[in-house]
């Protein structure tokens, strides 16, 4: 073993001297570079083919992972923006609740906290993106336009850019409005809690006009809000839907089923009760909420 190791070290040493004297590595490198230049187009085609195969394999794996999926259908009419899907679900949720969607006009979504509004918006946008990219939709049926997809969800303030939360919201909305002007291709947008970074009166006023303007400009908008006033102000241009909650004593559960019409329930204080906050806090909160509701009406 020692002799063979010594012979190996000697051969490696001689090879190193050989490379240093005759520049063998450089000669080989430039030889390969010459081949690459000659076969440049073939190599680019090979790389593109390899990438396409990897994408197709990934798509097949994704489809195998899904409990069910459908190949999407798209409208031929350029002015058709309708979004239709049956038994649609979010692919990243285990044992998801499926919902139907059939919208040719905008949707305003209300409902209590944790009832499923944000997840529904993500489901709508994500499945449209999957349909337009890998021809795969998590539903039993899907037919829609080919959209430019935008969202204003899960926003955060930016310390690096010096933007407050409200400024980030404004920029996000402006991005959607600018997109509408940039092309004739229909825009699909999802908006979660419009302008929640400001006071109630201005939020309701600005949200009403912003959402109304999106509808007038032909955008297919799915928006979620806790401001029940919007369901009245926008009833002529937005279809009202909501998610319900089921209350049993101190326990609250959610069926996650889309229901026609605006929400009439409130559960924020009930959730405080369910998580064990002092009764004095929740009772006083109930009384104050009822007083404020009475003043608004």
Language model: regions and residue ranges:
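ATPase nucleotide-binding head domains, primarily ABC-like/P-loop NTPase cores
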Residues: 59, 66-297
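Alpha-helical bundle segments enriched in helix-capping/polar residues
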Residues: 1-105, 297
């Amino acid at each position: 073993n020692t002799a063979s190791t010594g012979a190996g070290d000697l051969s490696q040493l001689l090879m190193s001297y050989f490379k240093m004297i005759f520049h063998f590595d450089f000669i080989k490198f430039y030889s390969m570079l010459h081949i690459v230049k000659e076969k440049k187009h073939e190599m680019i085609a090979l790389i593109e083919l390899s990438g396409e195969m990897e994408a197709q394999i990934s798509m097949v794996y994704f489809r195998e992972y899904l409990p069910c999926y459908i190949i999407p259908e798209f409208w031929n009419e350029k002015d058709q923006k309708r979004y239709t899907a049956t038994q649609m679900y979010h692919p990243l949720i285990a044992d998801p609740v499926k919902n139907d969607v059939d919208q040719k006009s905008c949707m305003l979504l209300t409902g209590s906290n944790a009832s499923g509004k944000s997840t529904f918006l993500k489901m709508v946008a994500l499945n449209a993106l999957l349909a337009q990219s890998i021809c795969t939709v998590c539903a039993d049926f899907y037919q829609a336009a080919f959209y430019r997809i935008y969202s204003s969800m899960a926003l955060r303030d930016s310390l690096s850019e010096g933007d407050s939360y409200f400024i980030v919201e404004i920029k996000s909305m402006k991005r959607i409005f600018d997109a509408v002007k940039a092309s004739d291709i229909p825009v699909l947008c999802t908006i979660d809690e419009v302008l929640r970074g400001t006071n109630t009166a201005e939020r309701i006023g600005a949200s009403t006009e912003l959402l109304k303007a999106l509808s007038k400009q032909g955008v297919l908008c799915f928006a979620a809000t806790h401001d029940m006033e919007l369901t009245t102000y926008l009833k002529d241009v937005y279809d009202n839907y909501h998610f319900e909650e089921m209350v049993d004593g101190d326990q609250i559960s959610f069926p996650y089923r889309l229901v026609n019409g605006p929400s009439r329930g409130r559960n924020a204080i009930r959730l405080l009760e369910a998580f064990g906050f002092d009764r004095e806090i929740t009772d006083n909160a109930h009384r104050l909420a009822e007083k404020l509701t009475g003043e608004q009406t």
